[in-house]
Amino acid sequence: MFEHIKAAPADPILGLGEAFKSETRENKINLGIGVYKDAQGTTPIMHAVKEAEKRLFDKEKTKNYLTIDGIADYNEQTKALLFGKDSEVIQSNRARTVQSLGGTGALRIAAEFIKRQTKAQNVWISTPTWPNHNAIFNAVGMTIREYRYYDAERKALDWEHLLEDLSQASEGDVVLLHGCCHNPTGIDPTPEQWQELAALSAKNGWLPLFDFAYQGLANGLDEDAYGLRAFAANHKELLVASSFSKNFGLYNERVGAFTLVAENAEIASTSLTQVKSIIRTLYSNPASHGGATVATVLNDAQLRQEWENELTEMRERIKKMRHLFVQLLKEYGAEQDFSFIIEQNGMFSFSGLTGEQVDRLKNEFAIYAVRSGRINVAGITEDNIRYLCESIVKVL
């Protein structure tokens, strides 16, 4: 039976990482996969995380299964981080959160819930977007509709066409929004634009789904939640798929969450039973360690402050690299204006490089990036940035 199976295409991002591992040139640089790198080019374990793990090791008494929805304290802390602990959504008990297997797992739960429990047929996804968005919703049989997001000429948000496309979204359609640090462009709506989108959504009856994987890496924990909280303020229903992979550095622990907001507490609780039914058929229950680590940090004032300080350092290092990157490209003779990179948020930048230029960077200089031109700014260090900029100028 299996002899008829054809090979699946390699994932465009994860496949790049495999190619990078086999690269033998000493000056190689990986700007592809989305993990944070520190000034030394490593993906460190945060100090607050390591201390929390030590505490867990000392007090852990069992390896028993978690419940289907995961660690209750983790779920409560996640809601507070998303909406603010004093938000109406939390005070009225309209939100339910379950621990998931990373942000990807949360998105799959969302897709399954929408398909099984609502009448929604269409999901509107920005173009460009993270490639797995389309794959996840195709897997559950939903119809993908695209809305324009990026203006390639201006290297900016294509606001006019975004509104034009989303004005066609019907009542009950799902609209997928990147909460902050849009992947791959790094371009986010302004607070005023978020408010306009929230008003349009409420007026037209969309079901908003936020992919929120980078909270704290744009401008701050509360600042980055502005868009989500604007929607929560005027929507009876919305969904959130969030992750602690990036802002806690817990990539291989697969620590995510799916959050559902309903009109009232009773509907929220009933909906949660269906979410748990979905989880039971997918993976039964989540792993403990990552969620317990996050809950330990967020529950302890000292550890939480240390984590927030470390997160600020990460955010500021990325911003510093953006400025230095633009400065050195100019110094090395780039005729194009790359200043737009400074205005982008988070780990990623849509650099403006073409697929052919990206291929040359890999083949001639051992610099790996996604062919769309997306680069991981967090992969740039003071040790590799001059070689990087010099190489880019040579392929322009």
UniProtKB/Swiss-Prot annotation:
L-aspartate binds at residues 34, 130, 183, 374. GO terms for molecular function: identical protein binding; L-aspartate:2-oxoglutarate aminotransferase activity; L-tyrosine-2-oxoglutarate transaminase activity; pyridoxal phosphate binding. One of its GO terms (biological process) is L-phenylalanine biosynthetic process from chorismate via phenylpyruvate. This is Aspartate aminotransferase. Homodimer. Its main location: cytoplasm. Belongs to the class-I pyridoxal-phosphate-dependent aminotransferase family. Its cofactor is pyridoxal 5'-phosphate. GO terms for cellular component: cytosol. It is an enzyme of class 2 (transferase). The modification N6-(pyridoxal phosphate)lysine is found at residue 246. It is found in: Cytoplasm. It comes from the Bacteria. It catalyses: L-aspartate + 2-oxoglutarate = oxaloacetate + L-glutamate. SUPFAM superfamilies: PLP-dependent transferases. PANTHER family: ASPARTATE AMINOTRANSFERASE, ASPARTATE AMINOTRANSFERASE, MITOCHONDRIAL. Pfam families: Aminotran_1_2 (PF00155). InterPro entries: Aminotransferase_I/II_large, Asp_trans, NHTrfase_class1_PyrdxlP-BS, PyrdxlP-dep_Trfase, PyrdxlP-dep_Trfase_major, PyrdxlP-dep_Trfase_small. Keywords: Aminotransferase, Cytoplasm, Pyridoxal phosphate, Transferase. Its EC number is 2.6.1.1. The keyword Cytoplasm applies.
